[in-house]
Regions:
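Short beta-strand His + acidic residue motifs that chelate non-heme Fe in jelly-roll/DSBH
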Residues: 100-103, 120-121, 155-162
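A short hydrophobic beta-strand segment most commonly corresponding to one strand
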Residues: 110-114, 163-180
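Conserved short histidine dyad/triad with adjacent acidic residue
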Residues: 90-104, 141-142, 151-153
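Acidic, low-complexity/disordered tracts enriched in E/D and polar residues
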Residues: 230-309, 334, 349-354
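Short acidic-glycine-tyrosine-enriched beta hairpin
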Residues: 84, 110, 125-156
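Short acidic, hydrophobic short linear motifs in intrinsically disordered regions
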Residues: 304-324
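A short glycine-rich, His/Asp/Glu-containing loop-to-beta-strand
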Residues: 65-96, 144, 284
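Glycine- and acidic-residue-biased ligand/ion/polar-headgroup-sensing regions
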Residues: 95-96, 106-125
Length: 354
């Protein structure tokens, strides 16, 4: 086996792919799994790579291209798949308290924490299947830069116990998710299905809301992490985030948005919204396949704006009625886009600041 050692001071994504091509990974479509030494060598390369912000910038550039194509679905969605090997690369996004719950990997994977931290719970797979209940085995803290791997089928549950978003980098086998064939019977209670259904797979217009919400939250998670990225590419990545819908991530040190005027349009022309008063709050509701859903609530100051939004399919922030400052209008518009109900359209324009 020929192992390529990467210079940890100058790791780029294409360098990593070149190194992986030199390892003894089976070709895509082959039934064989790689030898453990190949996975460990790949883990070593990942360990060097995630410490290099230019490497992360290269990967985030590919991730933003994926987000721009709007091809998201639940779980890890690869931003790149290696030709010939089928090895998949993806980012994991972890809001405060976020966890997918206990789930099973059935082939090798390598995971690195890029920003902030995670805690990883592992379960005794053999005992869990034998007793038909999840049996906790270990609990590992994983701070930024920590890299772990799975070689044999494993049950684990990462969780972000912090108050900030975390970002993880995943390199996975093309065979991860296949049934290893070593257990039979009903699914293990408490374990996520290997092939989770996409709950947005519906003809209802609310599907577009879910898709857009997922997209914009990931864009903003990236945008809010970019100030800590020591790379010349950080500025262009920030511009891309802003253009894709992360306009409130573009802030000077004062904490106020640097951009003012823009227009919003409902994410789907047939999406129905309504407005009600509830305990002194102005509440915006959407119509979903299961009925009305509360999306956004503002105090009495935003009552006129919410009533207006419930009726209008497109508008500029200055169109919103009420005694609102520019900053307040921006925050309402920001919240509307983060819900996935509205998308920004057209170019920015100058408007009067407070």
């Amino acid at each position: 086996m020929h192992v390529v050692l990467l210079d940890s001071t100058a790791v780029r994504f294409d360098d990593l792919c070149t190194a992986l091509q030199a390892l003894e990974f089976p070709s895509d479509g082959e039934r064989d799994h790689p030898e453990l030494r190949a996975v460990l060598a790949a883990r070593s390369s990942i360990q060097d790579a995630v410490l290099d912000d230019d490497f992360l910038a290269s990967c985030l550039h590919l991730e933003l291209q994926l987000l721009e194509r709007d091809e998201l679905r639940p779980g890890l969605v690869p931003f790149f798949t290696m030709p010939g090997l089928g090895i998949r690369f993806a980012f994991g996004y972890w809001p405060p308290g976020g966890s997918p719950g206990p789930h099973e990997h059935t082939a090798w994977t390598i995971t690195a924490v890029c920003r902030n931290e995670l805690e990883v719970l592992t379960y005794d797979r053999e005992e869990s299947y034998s007793r038909r209940e999840l049996v906790l085995k270990n609990r590992f803290p994983a701070s930024a830069g920590k890299v772990g791997y799975i070689y044999e089928p494993c049950i684990h549950a990462p969780i972000n116990n912090s108050s900030r978003w975390s970002l993880s980098f995943h390199m996975t086998s093309p065979r991860d998710g296949e049934d290893p064939g070593d257990v039979c019977g009903d699914p293990l209670p408490g374990l996520l299905e290997r092939a989770r259904p996409d709950r947005t797979n519906s003809d209802h217009v609310y599907r577009k809301v879910i898709e857009r919400r997922r997209q914009v939250r990931r864009i903003r998670a990236i945008g809010n992490m970019l100030p800590s990225l020591n790379s010349t590419k950080a500025s262009s990545l920030s511009d891309k985030c802003t253009a894709l819908g992360g306009f409130m991530t573009d802030r000077p040190e004062s904490g106020k948005p640097t951009r003012h005027g823009f227009a919003l349009e409902r994410v789907h022309k047939d999406l129905e919204l309504s407005y009600r008063l509830d305990a002194g709050m102005a509440v915006l509701y959407s119509e979903t396949p299961t009925g009305s859903l509360k999306e956004l609530a503002l105090d009495s100051l935003g009552r006129e704006a919410i009533a207006f939004v419930s009726k209008e399919r497109s508008f500029t922030i200055e169109d919103m009625p009420g005694d609102l400052s520019t900053e307040e209008r921006l925050h309402i518009a920001d919240a509307l886009e983060e819900t996935g109900l509205y998308v920004k359209i057209g170019d920015d324009y100058a408007c009067t600041s407070d």
